[in-house]
Amino acid sequence: MAQYIIRPTRKTPTSFAIIIDSTSYVKAKDAVMAYKNSVENDGLGTYIAVATWRNPEAIKSLLKQWHSNKQQPLEGAVFVGDIPIPMIRDAQYLTSAFKMNQKSDWKASSVPSDRYYDDFGLTFKSLKQDAEKQLYFYYSLSPKSKTYLSPDIYTGRIKPLEIAGKDKYELLKRYLYKVARLKNAEQNNVLDHLTMARGHGYNSEDRGAWAGEQLALREQLPSLFGQKATVKFLDFDTFYPAKLVYLNEAMDPQLDVLLFHHHGAPDTQYLNGNQAVSGVEASIKNIKRYLHAKVAERAKKVGADSAVSYYAKQLNVPESWCREAFDPTIQRRDSLFAADQDIYTSDLHQLKTNARFVLFDACFNGSFHADDNIAGSYLFNDGNTIATIGGTVNALQDKWPDEFIGLLATGMRVGNLNRFNGYLESHVIGDPTFHFTDNVHPGFSVNLALSLHHRDAKFWMQQLNHPLPDVQAMALRQLWLSGYRETQQLLTKKYNTSKDFVVRMEALKLLSL
């Protein structure tokens, strides 16, 4: 199909674009139009661009063209279906943690990133298209490019799962119809139910970090701590195993936001390890489970008897404990125990997750490029989850995942949250236009401010004393981006005088850049 464009039917201050491949459009046309109409009814004129996209360059050209339209500038876009995936090389310093020798397999040593599309100031050299994964297009960040991220628009991915027994186009249709339905049914939904859940071995182990985050959230989202709202902080070692408690929380039909802090893989949320115990019997059980796994693995290489003998001597434990690794009954028991430790995509496929927005502060959970992935599994089920944010590669623990999260209560679209606190690997998976109704400071349109007054020093100077700390913090970011000549003095003053944690933290962060 030749490129086909449907233009916005509403004149709005800014616009949005749905970029979709030809097959997905034909298979899900009515659902796509329902989604477009729901976005337009929400005050955002919407383009649809349909094509058999041969490379990312054509898409980026369209986005830049629409963004430069002064009458209705583009504020964001979503990539629906099989849209080319930029695989970025020579830019590892723009990730939070990813470091890999680029001599390794290019699929593993490149970063899947839509910063290629949404950050117009980054410049790239095209390298090649992957011979096996036809959607993968490799780019090298030019040495002449700017060296920091400052996306001009927000973007998101709606790429249905490709799993056995499911038609990906049917999954796409059902998701788009769901979003259209909920945008209409919940147009007055405010952010008044939030849950944070932590997994083991992460910065979750630091009680100081845990306490500090709660203090910051109270400052960013004060209405959550009032009489008519609910906020929960769940800990991996309070509920053991935590899996069922966390899944129950994810299925809560009232839940607005679910924040996860844990380790992750494309198909796994890691929640628990062996339980910290002090009793003798419980400690022996932990040791035995450890031995069963180690002995079974070593036996594949050296045989059962040799593996049993090795670990019995190495760890000074009875051989009988080691030999249990080959008992089918114990193998099944250990397997069930291990399955209860973590959340897998196979669990989510059977459930209805309802948290409207889920943030994964975890490695790999946002791997939209994988056929099956955690973020997509929260979206493509019969629940009410609309949007997620996650990373396509590993993630640093010592970062600020909640930066600007207080602006969600003012109606900020989740796409803008990722635009201003994301890394090279960070992506919205789902509808990036999703937002809550502003019940905090009606009259201040944060989305229009971030689009029409981006880097507008005069406008943001007027927001420095805004009653909401996160608006003040955003004002500091915008002034820094604008090149305001007295930025350093202003940041120093704010750090020394502000009563708000998040404002001081934003000032300190910007001073360090």
Where in the sequence are the language-model features?
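Cysteine-dependent hydrolase recognition
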Residues: M1-L513
